[in-house]
């Protein structure tokens, strides 16, 4: 089938609004997204163009967007630092203790905003990801002290659409301490930690460190109060896109045949739909989520985020000392779920 320039232009808009996902993630969302964008008049297209757009297959989407995707191929790394304190009091996570199918069991991790230089004070971002739904919230902190970690967790717990039932973390000292243990015990939250040396235990939140945090604010050094305020305003808006509109895939099975590993993923959908479709969700929570969803214009939200990140990048580059080159990597390229070897949603 031949697609005209108007169809490809509309496809590019949809792809950009959803954070440039792969075709297998974008295709299942097109019918819903096109309707939303037309409702807010972000897409002014004919019914015929809309019908052609939503009928595109994942493979066709990838082919048509190949040139656009090539423009954004930027790579980088995420930094987290291991540590140890009261490990004996915090059980190592095992699958027998952990119910991934129920919303409320989350993985937590921190992302460094040090600009490649760990010296001196700088901001961190706490990422919290629900395993069952993929719902993700982020908060940036001036440091990793218990005071700021717990304050961020309280904010995130209030923002989540369901109660937190379990917290799983790595062995970093910002998490393995009496303060977080007491916070979980007071709230009757199961508190577990990953196995030392097994990075894949926290694969869901590690993926979101990349897909949510690095693709939005990159690898610059953020160490001022103004930058911290901007970061948290960005996370408030990014939560709307990530949770209500960005499609995600979950690994269903992995079969090894000799040297070949075959992975099967489910149909891409959003954390919002995974949450509202789950039998454990109460009616009042579902109604509240749907009300919020109906008010979000994803294209306008994306523009707001872009404006805020531009302010953030201007702030951080303008304070760079003379003679120090500006980091080339502003943003990381999102890893696609269909190519990602981890168990992340």
Regions from the PLM with identified roles:
Residues 1-166, 171-345:
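Secondary-structure boundary/capping micro-motif
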